[in-house]
Amino acid sequence: MVSLRMHELPVNDQPRERLARLGAGALSDAELLAILLRVGISGTNVLQLAQQLLGEYGGWIGLQVADYNDLCRRTGIGASKAATIKAALEIGRRLARSSVEERYPIRSPGDVAALLMVEMSHLDQEHLRTVLLDTKHRVQQINTVYIGSLNSATIRIGEVFKEAVRRNSAAIIVVHNHPSGEATPSPEDIQVTRQLVAAGRLLDIEVLDHLIIGRGQYVSLRERGIGFE
């Protein structure tokens, strides 16, 4: 079967024209990515290139966490296209986060997971983040406190609460990921949780929960009654 070059497709079937006519929501993932890429390479039109990229990287999430330099080296991409992809995905990530941060209170562990799981479940190192909340449990700020192997010996309690004290936060939620993809709490996770809960009581900043994020899954230690006895 002979594949058509992009300019050989009927005008109404080309991604930009379809977007103008039907709106961005009507486009497939490959069509949206093709608009960012703009042009293909010899023998592969831009829509085919977009389909290949999404397949190779496992969709948008894979492209979001992909190394920029690796993308640059991919045939048909290069620095300019890689930068465009990364910038567009970062805009989407910030938009998704800001809509939750600015408008909605956190009511459940699922709300926090929805805010952070897509990004954190694919990190290749452990990250510990704090979600700072006001008196109505609206998100004030999200901070990355630590990157790397986390245990009770390396975590300084003061660092975890530093921004919460500065922002006069009413509560925090602690979130960290397991790069292995398994969200089961370790003994170290439980010990750290107990230390943080105790420190929060002294500082009058409630630790509402500690979430562990794995690959497409999360565990709420509060829901399991672990570390919050």
Swiss-Prot record:
<keyword id="KW-0862">Zinc</keyword>
<keyword id="KW-0482">Metalloprotease</keyword>
<protein>
    <recommendedName>
        <fullName>UPF0758 protein Cagg_0777</fullName>
    </recommendedName>
</protein>
<dbReference type="GO" id="GO:0008237">
    <property type="term" value="F:metallopeptidase activity"/>
</dbReference>
<dbReference type="InterPro" id="IPR001405">
    <property type="entry name" value="UPF0758"/>
</dbReference>
<dbReference type="GO" id="GO:0046872">
    <property type="term" value="F:metal ion binding"/>
</dbReference>
<keyword id="KW-0378">Hydrolase</keyword>
<dbReference type="InterPro" id="IPR046778">
    <property type="entry name" value="UPF0758_N"/>
</dbReference>
<dbReference type="InterPro" id="IPR037518">
    <property type="entry name" value="MPN"/>
</dbReference>
<feature type="binding site">
    <location>
        <position position="176"/>
    </location>
    <ligand>
        <name>Zn(2+)</name>
    </ligand>
</feature>
<dbReference type="Pfam" id="PF20582">
    <property type="entry name" value="UPF0758_N"/>
</dbReference>
<comment type="similarity">
    <text>Belongs to the UPF0758 family.</text>
</comment>
<dbReference type="InterPro" id="IPR010994">
    <property type="entry name" value="RuvA_2-like"/>
</dbReference>
<feature type="short sequence motif" description="JAMM motif">
    <location>
        <begin position="176"/>
        <end position="189"/>
    </location>
</feature>
<feature type="binding site">
    <location>
        <position position="178"/>
    </location>
    <ligand>
        <name>Zn(2+)</name>
    </ligand>
</feature>
<feature type="domain" description="MPN">
    <location>
        <begin position="105"/>
        <end position="227"/>
    </location>
</feature>
<keyword id="KW-0645">Protease</keyword>
<dbReference type="Pfam" id="PF04002">
    <property type="entry name" value="RadC"/>
</dbReference>
<dbReference type="InterPro" id="IPR025657">
    <property type="entry name" value="RadC_JAB"/>
</dbReference>
<keyword id="KW-0479">Metal-binding</keyword>
<dbReference type="InterPro" id="IPR020891">
    <property type="entry name" value="UPF0758_CS"/>
</dbReference>
<feature type="binding site">
    <location>
        <position position="189"/>
    </location>
    <ligand>
        <name>Zn(2+)</name>
    </ligand>
</feature>
<dbReference type="GO" id="GO:0006508">
    <property type="term" value="P:proteolysis"/>
</dbReference>
